[in-house]
Curated annotation (Swiss-Prot):
Residues that bear Phosphoserine: S4, S124, S127, S356, S610, S614, S616, S650, S666
Organism of this sequence: Homo sapiens (Human)
Modified residues (N-acetylalanine): A2
Mutation effect (S610A): Completely abolishes phosphorylation by ALK3 in vitro. NEDD9 and ASNS activation in response to BMPs is abolished
Gene: FAM83G
Protein name per Swiss-Prot or TrEMBL: Protein FAM83G
Location in the cell: Cytoplasm, Cytosol; Nucleus
Chain's role: Substrate for type I BMP receptor kinase involved in regulation of some target genes of the BMP signaling pathway. Also regulates the expression of several non-BMP target genes, suggesting a role in other signaling pathways.
Region DUF1669, residue ranges: 2-312
Keywords: Acetylation, Cytoplasm, Nucleus, Phosphoprotein
GO biological process, one term: BMP signaling pathway
UniProt feature, compositional bias: Polar residues: 452-465
GO cellular component: cytosol; nucleus
Pfam family membership, one: SACK1
Length: 823
């Protein structure tokens, strides 16, 4: 019924007097009687009622004509959408596009029985239409209301109203709901079809039922296909109905014009979706957003509930084409990878000289490209011939060509108070526990920041040289008749695959490594590979070796006293008595990188053959894991002065303000070098007698018998020793009779030891001082004592506790003659 008729049923309107002159005037019983007379008896009866009731003529000639043309006889059976007959009108048999999709396979839908005409039916006459394509959720608050008004023709440089509507359609993502009295614009309709088919946006259209035929003509010109029906729902509706007492009714038209987009925007006004309304008619629209859009949401759902479906089966359509691939814009993550993020975000990594983001991204892309198979390398092929492959940029375009932040200035760092020349220390970082209110220096965790760029470059060069050099071949043992003809290949090391082996923990007792000379040697070593060396305490105490060209053969680094070498006693180790040894022994720290070949490192594999005088010099005990290897008198050797050991970057370093000399070594080492040169001149006279003892004959040195061990408890494999050791083995029972001015007594035995030939090329090579001009850093002891203070024996004894070391040496010397057995 009309709203005026509904108001009559309300108790508030009983005996309510309202005249035509009041604004609230809406319902009039006199007007209702005049309309019933018009519908039942025609125009003459209408004018008679107006004159009798003395009311105004409230209908125009156009309205009278429209009412008379739309009068219908009320027939309850004719309202059934499943019925048949010519009275269906624009509903077109009541089958819409939603039902058509379900019956598109050609199978006819079975007709249901007609509904009963009972007063209280058991089921409804028609089903409630559902928003099956989806609808935005109803939210409590949609935001602040905003409105923009657009005119046609546009004013003040505004966009024309058709452009505003089409832009809203192209920006829709969820749903588009259109209510229109006349819809015949093909351009707007094509935009709606593309939004539903390509972007999967739900499209609902409600048009006036009196103009459905014009809408269907427009669909024929739009070249639709079956794919457009998937996300499209079209329905029709009219105005409100006016029922009379003569079982007749008439209906108004749908004059609402609005479009509801995504639940938060709406456009409404006088603009109809026609070409004339956008070009020749004067119209106005309002673009609304915010809370006011809720009224359009509720109104459309109510209209959709009372609407009728529109069938599109009579429209010629093509088959559904292949869906075009959706090319999504490539989104580069703003957050970099974990390895890059550490260097960019964490201030600690800002101190390290790392590569730029471009270089890191380039290296990572090259690694990924190298991992691909050969058939997949290169840019990936596009799915379609017209498509070009998209290459993702390495970093976000907004970050290109931007200067990196220097986080070093924001850190609590400071330089070393007394830095050494060429130090790689950049600064320190203090980490403070936030739970401590006033932290003391002892409660701070101090982190030392070093420059690792040079060490990284050297490691890369060494790794490349390891990969590029040829594979070594085993060398047969030299003939004893020509002991000085050849040099053993690969330093006489065992041959095997250079597979990386896992690191082992640092042992408590470590063997002293033999120092490798830079030049080739005239002594060849023949090494018998042991099958297995028994580790002690689960730790392998063997030393790794680096086999490769460029490594010199083994050379024994002998220990002499800092006094006159000719005054060596017989029967006492190193020519010293117990008291003098306790006072004058200098301990020199050796690191893993001090030797020329790196043979002092720890790792699996058999040890190099050694020409040490006794087992007591082969092994020694290390008190703490953090204390490096120690050896007596390693700065003054019979083969010439060795360059001062260089401090490795990974070793802990504490400076005491002492610098090396201008010639690259300590003054004490230079004075010892001069004394050594004098000693070599005196040994030159005995060169002829020493040549016979320096033969390259090898004797098998066996392990002690079962149940016995070496001096430090290490079961050792069979070893080959040079002729210098064979002289000791053959003359053990002879006593110290052979000890001459150029022989020295072994520490653990009673057999004199022959010094190398002073005139050998190896000796001359090692006797040359460093001339490269590079000032090497001193390698301090674990207690921070530089080399220049090692000559002060009492100062060293106070720091390192020499009595403990001396007592351990005396025990080893006491049991050495018992443990050493003849081969």
């Amino acid at each position: 019924m009309a709203f005026s008729q509904v108001q009559c049923l309300d108790d508030n309107h009983v005996n309510w007097r309202s005249s035509e002159s009041k604004p609230e005037f809406f319902y009039s019983e006199e007007q209702r009687l005049a309309l019933e007379a018009l519908v039942a008896r025609g125009r003459d009866a209408f004018y008679e009622v107006l004159k009798r009731e003395n009311i105004r003529d409230f209908l125009s000639e156009l309205e009278l004509k429209r009412i008379l043309e739309t009068i219908e006889v009320y027939d309850p059976g004719s309202e059934d959408p499943r019925g048949t007959g010519p009275s269906q009108g624009p509903e077109d048999n009541g089958v819409g596009d939603g039902e058509e999709a379900s019956g598109a396979d050609g199978v006819p839908i079975e007709a249901e029985p007609l509904p009963s005409l009972e007063y209280w039916p058991q089921k409804s006459d028609r089903s409630i239409p559902q928003l099956d394509l989806g609808w935005p959720d109803t939210i409590a608050y949609r935001g602040v209301t905003r409105a923009s008004v657009y005119m046609q023709p546009p004013i003040d440089g505004q966009a024309h109203i058709k452009e505003v509507v089409r832009k809203m359609i192209s920006q829709a993502q969820k749903v588009i709901a259109v209510v229109m009295d006349m819809f015949t614009d093909v351009d707007i309709f094509k935009d709606l079809l593309d939004a539903g088919f390509k972007r999967k946006v739900a499209v609902y259209i409600i048009v006036d039922e009196s103009n459905v035929k014009y809408f269907l003509h427009m669909c024929e010109r739009a070249c639709m296909h079956l794919g457009h029906l998937k996300n499209l729902r079209v329905r029709s509706s009219g105005g409100t109905e006016f029922f009379t007492r003569s079982a007749t009714k008439f209906k108004g038209a749908l004059a609402q014009k609005f479009m509801f987009v995504d639940g938060d925007r709406a456009v409404c006004g006088s603009y109809s979706f026609t070409w004339s309304a956008a070009r020749t008619d004067r119209n106005v629209i309002s673009v609304l957003s915010g809370q006011v859009v809720e009224m359009f949401d509720r109104q459309f759902q109510e209209l959709y509930l009372m609407s009728h479906s529109v069938s599109l089966k009579g429209i010629p359509m093509e088959k559904e084409p292949e869906p075009e691939p959706i090319v999504l814009p490539s989104v580069v993550p703003l957050v970099p990878a974990g390895t890059v993020a550490k260097k960019l975000v964490n201030p600690k990594y800002a101190l390290v000289k790392a590569k730029s983001v471009d270089e890191i991204a380039k290296i990572s892309s090259e690694k990924q490209e190298a991992k691909k198979p050969l058939g997949l390398k290169g840019p990936a092929l596009a799915e379609h011939p017209g498509e070009l492959p998209e290459l993702l940029p390495p970093i976000h375009p907004g970050l290109l060509h931007l200067e990196r932040a220097n986080m070093f200035e924001y850190l609590p760092t400071w330089v070393e108070p007394d830095p050494e020349p060429g130090s790689d220390i950049l600064g320190y970082i203090n980490i403070i526990d936030p739970n401590i209110w006033n932290p003391q220096p002892s409660q701070m965790n101090r982190i030392k920041i070093r420059d690792t760029s040079q060490a990284s470059a050297q490691h890369q060069l060494w790794k490349q040289s390891q990969d590029s050099r040829p594979r070594p071949e085993p060398c047969p043992p030299p003939e004893p008749s020509a002991p000085q003809d050849g040099v053993p290949a690969e330093n006489g090391l065992p041959q095997g695959d250079p597979e990386p082996l896992p690191p082992v923990p640092k042992p408590r007792t470590v063997p002293v490594a033999d120092v490798l000379a830079r030049d080739s040697s005239d002594i060849g070593w023949v090494l018998e590979l042991p099958k297995e060396e028994a580790p002690q305490n689960g730790t392998d105490h063997r030393l790794p070796r680096m086999a490769g060209p460029g490594h010199a053969p083994l050379q024994r680094q002998l220990s002499v006293t800092q006094d006159d070498p000719e005054s060596l006693g017989v029967g006492l180790p190193n020519g010293l008595d117990g008291v003098e040894e306790e006072d004058d022994d200098d301990y020199v720290t050796l690191s893993d990188q001090d030797s020329h070949s790196g043979s002092s490192g720890r790792g699996p594999g058999p040890r190099r053959p050694s020409v040490a005088s006794s087992v007591s010099e082969e092994y020694f005990e290390v008190r703490e894991h953090s204390v490096p290897l120690r050896r007596r008198h390693s700065e003054q050797v019979a083969n010439g002065p060795t360059p001062p050991p260089r401090r490795q970057l990974s070793a802990p370093h504490i400076t005491r303000g002492t610098f090396v000399g201008p010639q690259g070594g300590s003054p004490w080492a230079q004075s010892r070098g001069r004394e050594e040169a004098d000693a070599l001149k005196r040994m030159q006279a005995q060169r002829s007698t020493d040549k016979e003892a320096q033969g390259q004959q090898f004797h098998h040195h066996r392990v002690p018998a079962s149940g016995t061990r070496d001096k430090d408890g290490f079961p050792g494999p069979p070893r080959y020793r040079s002729a210098a050791d064979s002289v000791q083995s053959s003359t053990r029972n002879a006593g110290p009779a052979m000890a001459g001015p150029h022989h020295w007594q072994a520490k653990g035995g009673q057999v004199p030891r022959l010094l190398p030939d002073p005139g050998s090329p190896r000796l001359a090579q090692n006797a040359r001082p460093m001339t490269d001009g590079r000032a090497t850093e001193e390698h301090p002891s674990p207690f921070g004592i530089p080399y220049s203070k090692l000559s002060q024996s009492k100062h060293l004894k106070a720091r390192t506790g020499g009595s403990q070391w001396a007592s351990s040496d005396s025990k080893r010397r006491a049991q050495a003659p018992r443990d050493r057995k003849d081969p």
